[in-house]
Amino acid sequence: MVINSFISSISKEEKKGSVEFQVFCFTDKIRKLTSHLELHKKDFLSQRGMRKILGKRQRMLAYLSNKNKVRYKKLIGQLNIREPKTR
C-alpha cells in the first residue's frame, strides 16, 4: 500500500511535529471516520469530529502552501487528496 511506504519514509525523514506528518495523521483519521460513517449514517458526533479534523487539515495545507509550494504539491500528490477550492 502506498500509504504504508509513505509513513515509513516520512517518519524517518521528518519529525512528528512537521506539517507533513500532521496532515498525514489527519488524512488517516479522516479515512477511518469515512469508512465508519458509511456504516453508521446517523452518528452525528463522528460527523462533527470529522468536520473539525477536515478544518484542521485545511488550515495546515493552507499554511504549507503559503510557506513552501513544492512540499505542498508533493504532499497532495502522495496522499491523493484534492486541492481546496479557492475563493
Swiss-Prot record:
Broad class of the protein's primary localization: plastid
Keywords per UniProt:
Chloroplast, Plastid, Ribonucleoprotein, Ribosomal protein
Q: Does the keyword Mitochondrion apply?
A: no
State where the protein is found. Plastid, Chloroplast
UniProt xrefs under InterPro entries: Ribosomal_uS15, Ribosomal_uS15_bac-type, uS15_NS1_RNA-bd_sf
Give the GO terms filed under biological process for this record. Answer: translation
Any GO MF annotation of the entry: structural constituent of ribosome
UniProt entry tagged with the keyword Cytoplasm: no
Q: Which Pfam family would be a valid example here?
A: Ribosomal_S15
One cellular component term (GO) for this entry is: ribosome
Name the Gene3D superfamilies for this protein.
S15/NS1, RNA-binding (1.10.287.10)
Q: How does it assemble?
A: Part of the 30S ribosomal subunit.
What HAMAP family is this protein classified in?
Answer: Ribosomal_uS15_B
Query: Record's NCBIfam families?
Result: S15_bact (TIGR00952)
Q: Which family does it belong to?
A: Belongs to the universal ribosomal protein uS15 family.
Q: What is this protein called?
A: Small ribosomal subunit protein uS15c
